[in-house]
Regions:
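Glycine-rich, mobile lid/loop segments that gate access to catalytic sites or pores
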Residues: 8, 50, 68, 75, ...
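Internal helix-turn-beta structural module
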Residues: 48, 286, 293-383
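Glycine-rich anion/phosphate-binding loop at the beta-strand->alpha-helix junction
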Residues: 186-280
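N-terminal, positively charged regions that mediate nucleic acid binding
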Residues: 1-40, 375
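A short glycine-rich, hydrophobically flanked beta-strand micro-motif that places a catalytic Asp/Glu
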Residues: 39-43, 157-163, 213-217, 283-294
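Conserved phosphate/anionic-ligand binding catalytic regions in large, soluble enzymes, centered on
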Residues: 10-12, 16-21, 107-123, 224-248, ...
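Short, charge-patterned binding micro-sites
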Residues: 42-61, 295-299
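Short glycine-rich or small-residue beta-strand-to-loop segments that form or flank ligand, phosphate
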Residues: 6-13, 51-59, 115, 119-121, ...
Length: 383
């Protein structure tokens, strides 16, 4: 990598059409798990002007009123929940897949998949700075709308932050982009002033902008129509927003709309949990954890740890410690992280890894990891 480079990440508000589809899908998952912790759910949502479609596979002892869940979720995002025709198309999980997943004492992975977890020490959240700043902006947009700090704001919105690095250290913010839906008749200059005062300045208190930072607020001008009326929304289209802003590899599987037997979700959460504890323990400054699974198999077919040359121990020792310390089967990940509980909707906005109270964000394995790494490194050296 060059000595000097720029990294960029984006975020969206909970009223963004794609993210609202994710939220609806996770509300359906939660509604199923609330009554049946063993429910298998794969829910996709597509929405456009006047219509919302939820489709997928649900095998559960109790089925929720999905149209009611959808309308309630849309209302809570700031839109009219009764303004849409709702269509639900669901059926049970394929018996072939169910047989593969449930055939042994250990639940097998619901599909093959590759997932990545990442952590770095450049922010308190142990995430890349552009990711943290972009999510701060969209959180503040939603807060300003709900509290009516900026009364003209409507639910849809996006933000993007570019940070200049030198020798791997963030030095300055080179560009900030904020696009926010607003009521008709608002003067653009007034809106831009309000966003600068109530959104951008508070977001960058800890990492100030400079005179050369390019700040773009609603660069396209008028943004009155938003949400499903302006753009068709679909689950799984904000994968970089959900994870690490495109700054880390991604296996391609979406997080939302899936129960914990789907390793796209449980594996991604576990990989982040592992990486965060490695960095929190001081075992590395940066860490990428890679896991891969085969459908019907409980144990991963790949476990890789890359400390990017910053590790206190060798990557081999870190990998062996991870295999020893963490339960990497679907059952193990579900049990460790409480993924049989209705918790998913709470964490699906503003990135899945920015919520300090999420189970996969806890830094409670640092000491055992340190001990395991020391033992593994000693064993490697003795060979």
């Amino acid at each position: 990598m060059k000595d000097k480079y720029v990294l960029t990440a984006e975020s969206v508000t909970e009223g963004h059409p794609d993210k609202l589809c994710d939220t609806i899908a996770d509300a359906v998952v939660d509604a199923c798990l609330e009554h049946d912790p063993t429910a298998h759910v794969a829910c996709e949502v597509m929405a456009t002007a006047g219509k919302i479609i939820a489709a997928g596979e649900i095998t559960a002892a109790w089925l929720p009123d999905i149209p009611a869940v959808i309308c309630r979720t849309v209302r809570e995002a700031g839109y009219g929940g009764s303004d849409y025709e709702v269509e639900v198309i669901t059926h049970e999980q394929s018996p072939d897949i169910a047989g593969a997943v449930n055939s042994g004492a250990e639940t097998g992975a619901g599909d093959q998949g590759i997932v990545y977890g990442y952590a770095c020490d450049e922010t308190p959240e142990l995430l890349p700075l552009p990711v943290v700043l972009a999510h701060k902006l969209t959180r503040l947009l939603t807060q300003a709308r709900k509290l009516r700090t900026i009364p003209s704001l409507k639910p849809d919105g996006k933000a993007q932050v570019s940070v200049e690095y030198q020798f791997g250290v963030p030095k300055r913010v080179s560009a900030v982009v904020v696009s926010c839906q607003h009521e008709d008749g608002v003067e653009l200059a007034e809106l831009r002033h309000a966003v600068m005062r109530h959104i951008i300045q508070p977001a960058f208190q800890d990492f100030p902008l400079d005179a050369e930072t390019e700040i773009l607020i609603n660069p396209s001008g008028r943004f009155v129509e938003g949400g499903f009326e302006a753009d068709t929304g679909l689950t799984g289209r904000k994968l970089m927003v959900d994870t690490y802003g495109g700054l880390v590899p991604h296996g391609g599987g979406a997080l939302s709309g899936k129960d914990g037997t789907k390793v796209d979700r449980s594996g991604a959460y576990m990989a982040r949990y592992i990486a965060k504890n490695i960095v929190a323990a001081g075992l590395a400054e940066r860490c990428t954890v890679s896991l891969a699974y085969a459908i019907g198999r409980a144990k991963p077919v790949m476990v890789e740890v890359d400390a990017h040359g910053t590790g206190k121990y060798s990557d081999t020792a870190l990998e062996q410690a991870v295999r020893t310390v963490f339960k990497l089967t679907p059952n193990g990940m579900i049990d460790t992280l409480g993924l049989d509980k209705p918790i998913f909707r709470k964490f699906c906005n503003y990135g899945h890894f920015t919520h300090a109270d999420a189970p996969w964000e806890q830094m409670n394995m640092t000491e055992v990891l340190e001990s395991a790494c020391h033992a593994k490194e000693t064993g490697i050296s003795a060979r």
